[in-house]
């Protein structure tokens, strides 16, 4: 059996894996155990009551967190004309069409989010093998294919998170940084869970949000008692 590191022993002693914690207690635990030499992200895993093998039960979308994610987000926008000027005014770092596509083909990937106006998808479509595996391909469901690219840029800059269930029916995303206040992390988590509940597939049966766990970049997961969250039913 692998020897536990000092950090892992501390986590094991502090976190009861069988318990669901009050959100305030859960965040306090994360903060106490976040001893990395950098400001760790606070991530969330939400187990959904869906059958991910069925396409009509998959959950995908985006929502803006009230307190953002704590990350500086670089945005690339595929568009032209007046939309290009609007995207630049909204704060997009990279704006273009074919010339932007050529940069990406050459390996220049200095951005975190890709947004496209519908007329630009003919160009973006050719980048599927590059953007797709990185989770960067624009999609109408996440608001990244839209005629209003300026609003999409503002949302991305304001702390929009995109979510999509994995093959096990679990949503993984981030809700901030460990140096956020407890209230900020709580409100961000509540906003995410409310968005997920609104995105519940009509064919999904039974309990939809089955389990919520939060963790830091280098830490263990702490289960959250959903009764301590204020979310839409």
Curated annotation (Swiss-Prot):
CDD domains according to UniProt = Ribosomal_L1
Q: Which GO terms describe its cellular component?
A: cytosolic large ribosomal subunit
* Keyword vocabulary terms for this entry: Repressor, Ribonucleoprotein, Ribosomal protein, RNA-binding, rRNA-binding, Translation regulation, tRNA-binding
The keyword Magnesium is annotated on this UniProt entry: no
Question: According to its UniProt record, what is one Pfam family this protein matches?
Answer: Ribosomal_L1
Is tRNA-binding one of the keywords UniProt gives this record? Answer: yes
Cysteines joined through disulfide linkages:
none
Named from the GO MF annotations, one term is: structural constituent of ribosome
Q: Which InterPro entries match?
A: Ribosom_uL1_bac-type, Ribosomal_uL1, Ribosomal_uL1-like, Ribosomal_uL1/biogenesis, Ribosomal_uL1_3-a/b-sand, Ribosomal_uL1_CS
GO:BP terms for this protein? regulation of translation; translation
Q: Please give the function described in this protein's UniProt entry.
A: Binds directly to 23S rRNA. The L1 stalk is quite mobile in the ribosome, and is involved in E site tRNA release.
- State the similarity comment: Belongs to the universal ribosomal protein uL1 family.
Q: How does it assemble?
A: Part of the 50S ribosomal subunit.
**Name listed for the protein in its UniProt record:** Large ribosomal subunit protein uL1
Per the UniProt record, the source organism is Shewanella denitrificans (strain OS217 / ATCC BAA-1090 / DSM 15013)
Question: Taxonomic lineage of this organism?
Answer: Bacteria, Pseudomonadati, Pseudomonadota, Gammaproteobacteria, Alteromonadales
């Amino acid at each position: 059996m692998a020897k536990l590191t000092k950090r892992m022993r501390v986590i094991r002693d502090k976190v009861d894996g069988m318990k669901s914690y009050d959100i305030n207690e859960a965040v306090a635990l994360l903060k106490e155990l976040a001893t990395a030499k950098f400001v760790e992200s606070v991530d969330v895993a939400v187990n959904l009551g869906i059958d991910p093998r069925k396409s009509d039960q998959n959950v995908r979308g985006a929502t803006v967190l009230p307190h953002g994610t704590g990350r500086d987000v670089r945005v690339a926008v595929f568009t032209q004309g007046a939309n290009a000027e609007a995207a630049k005014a909204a704060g997009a770092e990279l704006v273009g069409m074919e010339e932007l596509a050529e940069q990406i083909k050459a390996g220049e990937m200095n951005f975190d989010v890709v947004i496209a106006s519908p007329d630009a998808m003919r160009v973006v479509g050719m980048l599927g093998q590059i953007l797709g595996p990185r989770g960067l391909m624009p999609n109408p469901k996440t608001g990244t294919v839209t005629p209003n690219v300026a609003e999409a840029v503002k949302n991305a800059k304001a702390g929009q998170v995109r979510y999509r269930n994995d093959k096990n029916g679990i949503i993984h995303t981030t809700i901030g940084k460990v140096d956020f206040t407890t209230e900020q992390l709580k409100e961000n988590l509540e906003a995410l869970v409310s968005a997920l509940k609104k995105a519940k597939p009509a064919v999904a049966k039974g309990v939809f949000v089955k389990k919520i766990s939060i963790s830091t970049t280098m830490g263990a997961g702490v289960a959250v008692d959903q009764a301590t969250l204020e979310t839409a039913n």
